[in-house]
Amino acid sequence: MSRVKSGKVTHARHRKVIKAAKGYYAARSTNFRTATQAVDKANQYATRDRKARKRNFRALWIQRINAAVRLFDLEMTYSRFINGLAKAGIEVDRKVLADLAVHEPEAFNAIAARAKAALA
């Protein structure tokens, strides 16, 4: 029985890892073992931060909405505003509300007025 050699497969696998580590510092970009560790850690960070990005953007939207609501009415808070939206039957997500607050303040103020009226 002939001997099985895996030179091409191993070389391709190594080349794939080294290509993924391109731009890393020192041996992390050239040495297969350290490059493998660096790429694995980078993938862990990437996965973690994809999840964190969603939380960060939601927090940013809430901050922007809260600031715009307080500009509209000093007595109104973010939580009261969201409660007013629910009572008024306005189903707009936070991303759209934050975008309106930044780019279309008149439209946001109209929505805030309807939310305030629903609370009264």
Curated annotation (Swiss-Prot):
HAMAP family reported in the protein's UniProt record: Ribosomal_bL20 (MF_00382)
Q: Which family does it belong to?
A: Belongs to the bacterial ribosomal protein bL20 family.
Kindly state a single biological-process term from the GO annotations of this entry. translation
> Which CDD domains would you find in this protein's record?
Ribosomal_L20
Q: Which Gene3D superfamilies match?
A: 6.10.160.10, Ribosomal protein L20 (1.10.1900.20)
User: A GO molecular function for this record?
Assistant: rRNA binding
Q: What does this protein do?
A: Binds directly to 23S ribosomal RNA and is necessary for the in vitro assembly process of the 50S ribosomal subunit. It is not involved in the protein synthesizing functions of that subunit.
Q: What protein does this entry describe?
A: Large ribosomal subunit protein bL20
Question: Which species does the entry assign this protein to?
Answer: Cereibacter sphaeroides (strain ATCC 17025 / ATH 2.4.3)
- Residues in the signal sequence: none
For this protein, the record's Pfam families field holds: Ribosomal_L20
Q: Which UniProt keywords apply?
A: Ribonucleoprotein, Ribosomal protein, RNA-binding, rRNA-binding
One cellular component term (GO) for this entry is: ribosome
Q: Does the keyword RNA-binding apply?
A: yes
